[in-house]
A protein has these predicted regions:
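Short aromatic-glycine-(Arg/Gly/Cys) micro-motifs in beta-strand/loop hairpins
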Residues: 1-28, 69-95
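Hydrophobic beta-strand residues in large extracellular and virion-surface proteins
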Residues: 6-8, 30, 78, 101, ...
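Generic structural motif
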Residues: 11-13, 38, 83-85, 104-106, ...
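Short, mixed-charge low-complexity intrinsically disordered segments
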Residues: 12, 43-82, 117-143
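Short N-terminal helix-initiation segments at or just after the protein's N-terminus
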Residues: 22-30, 40-47
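A short, exposed loop/beta-hairpin motif centered on an aromatic-Gly-Thr core
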Residues: 24-36, 93-104
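Short amphipathic alpha-helices within nucleic acid-binding modules
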Residues: 38-44, 107-111
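Mixed-charge, glycine-accented linear interaction segment located at domain edges/termini
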Residues: 98-128
Length: 143
């Protein structure tokens, strides 16, 4: 599975029933199969809510990233450095991974990340945990 961040401009209805173009675009995290166009998933999702056609401004593939399944309204991004020892050579191998976590607060996201850490092998260090401006996580053709 691949993860991509898709930025889309959309005209939405606001509280006064007037239509408004979303300024800088909305960001969506899309989990998709390799080779699939993640922008199409966002367009399909947003089209019923948009007055005019949705414009995809950009798509960026998130390498070395995964989603931690959790509940919450805000999406956080954690950068974690993993350290694994090669038993044949005795060398330590370090790699960084990004984890996207739903939570209502930093502590919720941190606890969800630590729960996920029970499945990891080797040592790890949480380098950063920050709030993102991603609106929603979409799953496209993920069976």
């Amino acid at each position: 599975m691949n993860l991509s961040i898709v930025v889309a401009k959309v005209v939405r209805e606001n509280a006064q029933y007037k239509y408004k173009l979303v300024g800088k675009g909305e960001r969506y995290l899309v989990q998709h199969q390799e080779g699939d166009n993640s922008g199409n998933a966002v367009m399909k999702y947003l089209t019923p809510y948009a007055k005019e056609p949705v414009v995809i401004e950009g798509v960026s593939l998130q390498k070395h990233s995964e989603i931690v399944e959790s509940f919450g309204e805000v999406i956080y991004k954690a950068v974690v450095q993993h350290v694994v020892e090669d038993f044949d050579t005795g060398r330590l191998h370090k790699s960084k991974r990004n984890y996207f976590i739903n939570g209502d607060s930093y502590s919720d996201a941190y606890e969800s990340l630590l729960a996920e850490a029970n499945n990891w092998v080797g040592l790890f260090e949480i380098i950063s945990l920050s709030k993102t401006n991603i609106i929603e996580v979409l799953y496209d053709n993920c069976n």
